[in-house]
């Protein structure tokens, strides 16, 4: 098979590269999306705990970068696009902590190797799963999300912002967060016939 990447055509030189190209080809049933967790130049303990726990929920479809990276997602996204393409990942979380924006997570979605959207959120508190005396989630399990309130509703009937009392820009951010989290932790598609 020949892979068309914009203008260049890459042919596999050996069996290993052929298998790698076949793995990236379009499929009838797509695999779960892979996520990359990247630490910025400075991260606080809160951000480190949050990223570790989010990556644990995403396993086995999570790649955690160990080294710190000088990355500013909103200023230059080329490194994010490179990492996504190199690791065959379409989701990234970049953790950082700066003086003006402490304890931040930047969620990034890629489509076709390009940044589709980004959402920046602050971390107020982070607690490790080890602090809770319960069973830990198994690998590959999906978390349960409950979105409550008028900010998360997208029904046109109830989308009257004046009646809901929600700010239109804030409501858009809440809907964006809902979409991103559900896409991020969607997991493996299950076959309805089995």
Task: Say what each PLM segment does.
Residues 3-194:
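Phospho-regulatory, Ser/Thr- and acidic-rich intrinsically disordered linkers and terminal tails
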């Amino acid at each position: 098979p020949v892979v068309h990447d914009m203008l260049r055509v890459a042919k596999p030189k050996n069996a290993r590269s052929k298998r790698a190209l076949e793995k990236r080809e379009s499929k009838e049933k797509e695999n779960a999306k892979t996520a990359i967790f990247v630490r910025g130049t400075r991260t606080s303990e809160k951000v480190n705990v949050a990223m570790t726990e989010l990556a644990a929920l995403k396993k086995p479809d999570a790649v955690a970068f160990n080294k710190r990276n000088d990355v500013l997602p909103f200023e230059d996204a080329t490194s994010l696009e490179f990492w996504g393409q190199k690791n065959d990942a379409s989701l990234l979380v970049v953790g950082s902590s700066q003086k003006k924006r402490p304890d931040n997570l930047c969620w990034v979605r890629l489509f076709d190797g390009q940044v589709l959207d980004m959402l920046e959120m602050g971390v107020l508190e982070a607690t490790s799963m080890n602090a809770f005396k319960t069973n830990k989630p198994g690998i590959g399990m999906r978390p349960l999300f409950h979105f409550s309130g008028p900010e998360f509703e997208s029904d046109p009937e109830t989308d009257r912002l004046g009646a809901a009392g929600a700010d239109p820009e804030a409501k858009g951010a809440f809907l964006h967060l809902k979409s991103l989290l559900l896409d991020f932790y969607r997991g493996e598609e299950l076959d309805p016939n089995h």
